[in-house]
């Protein structure tokens, strides 16, 4: 059904500042094809669009599964408990910009309702729930996968009728030491490099509010 991630929709208070921040992050001014900075008029919340091969057919199937979508040319989008979700049928996106940290490793969502977010991602969009884990420090995480995209959901101990939200992006780098050195030369504030929760990973937090969402770099050894 879903073939790949089309784009991530981010709500940015200042578009020019956000563009500059992502140019610093990637080390290039070339726009990232999977980032939509600023919400379109049909998106009331940040969220995700997914690429499909037969938009009318998949839209009907998703609608039957309980997610009502509205057509916008080559898109069909809707709202799901605080997230904008949608489908797109259009030519394959251009390659990510030629930077050292410009590939999306995974997305992070917040949700107060385990069953509801599973129904949204698995029941309506066809994701697989790969891992349901309670960390030793008390954080409950769900990990989903679909067409190469990993989505991590952090379950919040809030009112279960409250909204879900797009919370953060992890960007893959082949050499986190080199990426951090480049960013520090560009006056970007970073955390120290540390071991990630996943064995064999190292991560660093990028402390730049103009990126609009919490952002980390991750290296997989």
Residue ranges of predicted features:
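Active-site-proximal beta-strand elements of phosphoester/diester hydrolases
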Residues: 36-41, 86-87, 153
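Proline-rich intrinsically disordered, low-complexity coils
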Residues: 13, 31-33, 40, 46, ...
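Vicinal oxygen chelate
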Residues: 1-14, 37-113, 133, 137, ...
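Core segments of cupin and vicinal oxygen chelate
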Residues: 1-38, 61, 109-150, 178, ...
């Amino acid at each position: 059904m879903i073939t790949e991630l089309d784009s991530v929709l981010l709500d940015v208070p200042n578009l020019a500042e956000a563009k500059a921040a992502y140019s610093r992050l990637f080390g290039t001014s070339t726009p990232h094809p999977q980032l939509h900075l600023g919400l379109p008029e049909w998106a009331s919340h940040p969220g995700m669009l997914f690429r499909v091969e037969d938009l009318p057919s998949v839209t009907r199937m998703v609608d039957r599964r309980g997610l009502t979508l509205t057509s916008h040319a080559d898109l069909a989008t809707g709202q799901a408990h605080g997230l904008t979700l949608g489908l797109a049928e259009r030519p394959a996106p251009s390659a990510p910009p030629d930077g050292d940290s410009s590939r999306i490793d995974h997305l992070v969502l917040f949700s107060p309702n385990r069953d509801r977010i599973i129904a949204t991602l698995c029941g309506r969009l066809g994701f697989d729930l790969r891992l349901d884990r309670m960390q030793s420090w008390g954080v409950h995480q769900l990990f989903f996968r679909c067409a190469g995209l990993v989505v991590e959901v952090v379950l919040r101990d809030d009112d279960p009728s409250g909204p879900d939200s797009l919370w953060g992006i992890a960007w893959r780098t082949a050499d986190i030491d080199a990426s951090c050195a480049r960013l520090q030369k560009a006056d970007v504030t970073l955390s120290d490099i540390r071991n990630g929760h996943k064995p064999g990973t190292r991560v660093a937090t990028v402390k730049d509010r103009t990126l609009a969402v919490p952002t980390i770099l991750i290296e997989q050894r």
